[in-house]
């Protein structure tokens, strides 16, 4: 089985567009459809025909180009069953634990409510790829629009059990702000400090910070580290639950 090929580019202001291409079948999936023109440019540049859209959630900046791409390519749109009525052009609705094949590549669906009520992530099992959209960012997580903090904490735990080497592709280039915030709640984390310096340099050069890895996030992302004693001491929350610590971190980030 040939490895998948990926193309990553910016859409809108800070959305990531991602195309996933299977060279054996010619299938090409857009991970969400934030904006038509950059997606078409990337597909044309690579000589790929878009056959699928894997929608993660219903927010406008992730589904804007669904219908235009479907009209042009006749692509199949897959998306979350619990947001089915809000996904333009949806063909197949997926629930937590569902799986399907993209060529010979197995894709598992992980429902991660928090940012939205029915948000899903796509895990390419053998390829060790996770498309986490607005659930898990590099050094961050999505804002809580439709579900409480406890739900998002448990959603993140569902991702955290995947292999550490899993490459994580996320929905927005928020990493620099996330790094600066992370240092306020985990200031003595040496790995975080070195990573923040790397991110500052990357962004100064106009380079992307995508992908990250799950292992790196577990070492440095405060939203995955609510159980960490140092973070709890810094927040003066030693006796609180993981959900309460996570909620406090999310609240602080909202006002950062």
Curated annotation (Swiss-Prot):
Zn(2+) 2 binds at residues 61-62, 134, 172. It is an enzyme of class 3 (hydrolase). Keywords: Hydrolase, Metal-binding, Zinc. Pathway: Secondary metabolite metabolism; methylglyoxal degradation; (R)-lactate from methylglyoxal: step 2/2. Binds 2 Zn(2+) ions per subunit. The keyword Hydrolase applies. The keyword Disulfide bond does not apply. One of its GO terms (biological process) is methylglyoxal catabolic process to D-lactate via S-lactoyl-glutathione. Its cofactor is Zn(2+). GO terms for molecular function: hydroxyacylglutathione hydrolase activity; metal ion binding. Zn(2+) 1 binds at residues 57, 59, 115, 134. InterPro entries: Clx_II_MBL, Glyoxalase_II_hydrolase, HAGH_C, Hydroxyacylglutathione_Hdrlase, Metallo-B-lactamas, RibonucZ/Hydroxyglut_hydro. It catalyses: an S-(2-hydroxyacyl)glutathione + H2O = a 2-hydroxy carboxylate + glutathione + H(+). It comes from the Bacteria. Its EC number is 3.1.2.6. Thiolesterase that catalyzes the hydrolysis of S-D-lactoyl-glutathione to form glutathione and D-lactic acid. Belongs to the metallo-beta-lactamase superfamily. Glyoxalase II family. PANTHER family: HYDROXYACYLGLUTATHIONE HYDROLASE, HYDROXYACYLGLUTATHIONE HYDROLASE GLOB. NCBIfam families: GSH_gloB. Monomer. This is Hydroxyacylglutathione hydrolase. It comes from Rhizobium johnstonii (strain DSM 114642 / LMG 32736 / 3841). The gene is gloB.
